[in-house]
Amino acid sequence: NCLNFGNPEKGKVMGQFVETIDGISQACTYLDFPVVSGNVSFYNETQNKAISPTPTIGGVGLIKNLNLMMTKNLKEIGSYIFVVGKTSGHLDQSEFFREVLKIYEGPSPEINLFNEKNNGKAIQKLILSKLVNSVHDISTGGILLTLSEMCIAGKIGAKIKVPQDNVGPHEYLFGEDQSRYLIEVNEKSKDKTCN
């Protein structure tokens, strides 16, 4: 674990550091997630310009039954892939904005600890109930990159149907809303999983 920041003698940088510590503290308390060690690195600057605040936290968990360990690779041709969590299509600060459109502004996606905990518990329940073949968290790159990683790992392709609701196709496929997962479900588990 490491927290990397610029010069703490500058008010903006110290403010970023304080807000980061506060956010980590809130998340660890709410999610009952211990951070057992850490390092802080200050004065990370180039030509008197600070790096972006870069907190890095590694997590370790216990898997009670290795036979239920979940991986991201798609397992079965003809299975269904569902999104768990709300998709609002947040593109600000996304890989799509930065890498494709060269837009480097806007707020980061909102983090809702209640949704994070509840969606995580729902995924855990699906895994323990043996209702899913594979699971992958949706993060950098949104649904499309996450699904690509699952397809490549499983050497299986996928067809995507973008819902016709209030989120456009780019927002749906590349949005980086938090607390979401892609799950692979086979035909016999589909009805139980969706209830």
Kindly give the residue locations of the regions a language model identified.
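Mobile "lid/hinge" segments at catalytic clefts and subdomain interfaces of large enzymes
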Residues: 1-7, 13, 17, 25, ...
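Glycine-/charge-enriched secondary-structure boundary and capping motifs
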Residues: 13-27, 31, 36, 40-56, ...
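Hydrophobic side chains in well-ordered alpha-helices
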Residues: 119-122, 192-193
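Internal, well-ordered alpha-helical scaffold/interface segments
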Residues: 121-124, 145
